[in-house]
Amino acid sequence: MFIAGRVFSFWFIVIVMAAMFASIYRSTKLGKPPKLRPLAQVNAIDEAVGRATEMGRPIHFSPGFAPLINLDSAQTFAGLALLSYTAKLAAKFNAPLIVTINQPDVFPLAEEIVAEAYVQAGNREGLKADTVRYLSDQQFSYSAAVFGLIMRERPAANLLLGRWDAASLMIAECGA
């Protein structure tokens, strides 16, 4: 059952995890939730949305290349969670948002996330029909479409979150 030479590592991990869960359980019973530090990346999103609002220019957001049913779908769901956060900020500050999608199964989910964020922020009128755009499911065709969009719209913030391949460097350079 156990691999020779790994018994100590196994029991060490079990003891450390048990101690961690016990301390978290005890602290929540006392009414003190564990202290979590803020993520610098989320603070950067706040700054980027604020900068775009001040400049009066749009925010470009893309949740990456992975579809919803894939080994890499967790990265897409993380990108969509950050899309919700970014869309709420954009709706709150009335900053134009452009969301580009390259997977057909992600498109309706992204549309619903953005619409819900605008409704929650009380800015239903700020939502435009072309806020979420499906471009292409091919990596470099998508990149070319994003290049054109960046050149036309001149976004103040270019947020690429989720799973990315070779095109991410080109899009980031174009959007810089």
Regions found by a protein language model. Give the residues of each.
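Membrane-cytosol interface motif
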Residues: 37-54, 58
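Histidine-anchored nucleotide/phosphate-binding helix
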Residues: 48, 74-94
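Long, charge-dense
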Residues: 89-91, 95-143
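Short, strongly hydrophobic alpha-helical membrane anchors
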Residues: 1-5
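Soluble extracytoplasmic domains of inner/organellar membrane proteins
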Residues: 134-175
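Gly/Ser/Thr-rich loops at beta-strand to alpha-helix junctions
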Residues: 64-69, 75-76, 80, 103-107, ...
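Transmembrane-cytosolic junction motif
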Residues: 22-43
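Hydrophobic core segments of alpha-helical transmembrane domains in multi-pass membrane transport
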Residues: 13-25
